[in-house]
């Protein structure tokens, strides 16, 4: 959203498809009546509020930061989690399911407790 503020392009954010279903619908609703060329500061502010209200782990998944439970993980383990997190063909619910499955298979007990 910050990058969008520095440009004159106003539109539904490109990450909207990566959001959980409820937040996806909320952001689409925010932008539904927007007309190209109009001021979009209200839409940007409301969208930012939706993002700010996301739990940390969801925000990390949507915007690409690795969650803290992976801080001590090997490079290979981090790569496996990144492959799921950055997979644009999976929606949020499928990513969550795949990440949970992977976590059960490869994380240590300590990491799994933090997961």
UniProtKB/Swiss-Prot annotation:
Changing residue 59 to Q: In strain: Isolate Guatemala. It comes from the Eukaryota. Antibodies against this antigen can recognize a human retinal pigment epithelium antigen explaining in part the retinal damage caused in onchocerciasis. This is OV39 antigen. It comes from Onchocerca volvulus.
């Amino acid at each position: 959203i910050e990058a969008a503020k520095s440009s004159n392009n106003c539109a539904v954010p490109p990450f909207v498809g990566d959001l959980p279903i409820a937040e996806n619908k909320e952001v689409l609703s925010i932008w539904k009546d927007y007309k190209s060329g109009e001021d979009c500061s209200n839409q940007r502010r409301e969208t930012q509020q939706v993002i700010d209200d996301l739990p940390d782990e969801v925000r990390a998944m949507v915007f690409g930061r690795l969650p803290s439970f992976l801080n001590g993980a090997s490079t290979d383990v981090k790569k496996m989690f990144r492959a799921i997190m950055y997979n644009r063909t999976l929606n949020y619910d499928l990513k969550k399911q795949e990440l949970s499955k992977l976590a059960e298979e490869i994380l240590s007990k300590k990491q799994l407790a933090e997961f």
